[in-house]
């Protein structure tokens, strides 16, 4: 990445995206705890002061990357679902979780966003994040509405429930990176209370109902 000053709006957008791309590479290779603005400056060849022109803190940068990864995941999931017809709710629930869990960095940042990133960024960055979550829910609700012919409000509630269930599963699952450190009773419980199990336990009972036909009771 060149250190020349980005002057035009397009150049600034390109530089911002380049910074995010490099940050993603570092996070995937070294992990969150090892990621610093110093390491990013070294890898990009930019001064730290330049990085702070685009992101006011490490947390703001990582939150922006999380939003980007989350948008990409929703894109992939919705595209893949076009081939999965006729719709099967239980199968969709499993595919939804699997598509999310396929990206380890997305999973890691999703677990950090609410308590480890958002509290440490300015209001503007928080607003951007909340709007991104709403955008994701709106797009997913469109899938539910189209595939299951449910009421729009129900489709929207279901989409939010799916996203909340992902967060809840990360917090409540009996699961660690190394389950061997768990006591025997928790290892046994973890066999039926993994993140995937907790997620499915929350969303499977929420199968959408078809919209009622307002003319269904009218006899010809």
What is the meaning of each model-derived region?
Residues 1-5, 18:
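N-terminal, Lys/Arg-enriched amphipathic/low-complexity engagement segments
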Residues 2, 138-142, 146-149, 164, ...:
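C-terminal peripheral helix-coil segments that are non-catalytic and often amphipathic
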Residues 12-23, 40, 65-69, 73, ...:
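Generic hydrophobic, amphipathic alpha-helix propensity
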Residues 18, 26, 30-60, 64:
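Helix-turn-helix
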Residues 62-69, 132, 136:
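Alpha-helical DNA-contacting segments of helix-turn-helix folds
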Residues 101-124, 174-180:
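Amphipathic alpha-helical segments used for helix-helix packing
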Residues 119-149, 156, 160:
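Amphipathic alpha-helical packing segments from all-alpha helical-bundle domains
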